[in-house]
A protein has these predicted regions:
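Enzyme catalytic cores with a strong preference for nitrogen-chemistry domains
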Residues: 1-179
Length: 179
């Protein structure tokens, strides 16, 4: 249970500090998003969020937290993480245009019960993002490989993009337990 090792979790902040500086030094005005286990310093447990950090201009900040925490099959995220209540929209000025980027983490996309046959979650980040009028949907995932899962992921992703009527940037892990 690496997520229970406080020093390991705290070390990721030092690595992010250095990575943000290195990226800025080498690439200048480049923005990068990464997934992290965000520590919350209070007396409640679990004291982590599954979060997205934005690295840019030599610094980093949290821009999104996971809303839907799966607890089925290989997933037991409620054991380690808190659930965020609100969707995250990052407003970026790029080449004289203002962009509203809606961020989701993995399961936050899986809200259409017709696709997979599972019950719909009580929370619906995709519906909430529609109210925020995002221009682009970004999903960071770390989904393990499963036979024929790519086809299902494509359907889920397509549903979200069509529902929001925006392009989707979908990023999944490689290596590790992705075979």
């Amino acid at each position: 249970d690496l997520l229970l090792k406080k020093n390991l979790i705290k070390n990721q902040y030092q690595i992010l500090d250095q990575l943000a500086l290195d990226i800025n030094k080498k690439y200048g005005n480049l923005s990068i998003t990464v997934g992290i286990a965000e520590i919350i310093n209070d007396s409640f447990f679990p004291n982590l969020y599954n979060s997205i950090a934005l690295l840019e201009r030599g610094e980093w900040k949290i821009i999104a937290r996971k809303i839907i925490l799966p607890t089925y099959e290989v997933f037991d995220e409620k054991r380690y993480f808190r659930s965020e209540e609100k969707v995250s929209v990052l407003i970026k000025q790029i080449k004289n245009k203002t962009w509203r980027l809606g961020f989701t983490i993995c399961e936050d996309l899986w809200v259409n019960k017709n696709i997979e046959g599972r019950g719909i979650h009580k929370k619906n980040p995709i519906s909430d993002l529609k109210k925020k009028k995002v221009d682009i949907l970004v999903n960071l995932s770390a989904s393990p490989y499963t036979f024929k899962k790519l086809e299902l992921r494509s359907k889920v992703s397509s549903f979200a993009a069509k529902y929001l009527q925006v392009p989707l940037i979908y990023v999944n892990q490689i290596g590790a337990n992705d075979n």
